[in-house]
């Protein structure tokens, strides 16, 4: 009933503002989001653009400025955090839908229920505990994106510099390939990854560790103490590799924590 009233009220407002032309304006408003979001985004948004997060689907951000379709241009962000009212995730991204939501909040006409994972960082070093586990599970997609950027990226770059011509050809664009969710790997990509891992032992180590960390997150339905035990075992294994990029990533894991709930 509420949505029907909204649609009817919008028609009346358009008729008041634009006269008979308001019917055309209203019709465009009614089909704009369903047509572009459901029709265009679910097609183009799975084949063209870039990915911030390795969600287990082929979703992509078509363009960093979400201006025309309520921010749905940031489709990969939306698929990764489907309950979030805010679709922009990077400093260079803009979500027009979030802009209007914040404006309505400022005017006291709306309130935000969710805008993504509720996680904070504390740079003071401390041992891993269950609070870290909850925070890491909550923000696991961003954690894995960080692993790709700060571990896989630098190591692949260093190995590329040391490689011969054939090795460089194989390692070109390897950083993105080595971060892709296994569900999305076709036969050709799997073969290329196998060749990379056979050629370079160091890259094989960080790739295997990435897969093992993904397995830790898959235990999120288990008791938190079990997940903590698995995470500590992964950390111990990663530290044993004595790789600087890995060490820095491992140290960052204990900085994630869940904020205290707002009791006001």
Model region roles, listed by residue range:
Residues 2, 83-84, 223:
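Short, solvent-exposed coil/turn linker segments
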Residues 196-264:
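C-terminal non-catalytic accessory extensions
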Residues 1-72, 92-196, 212:
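Hydrophobic transmembrane alpha-helical segments that form the core helix bundle
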Residues 78-82, 209:
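Short acidic (Asp/Glu) and glycine-rich catalytic loops that position anionic groups and cofactors
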Residues 45-49, 81-86:
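Interfacial helix-loop-helix junctions of multi-pass membrane proteins
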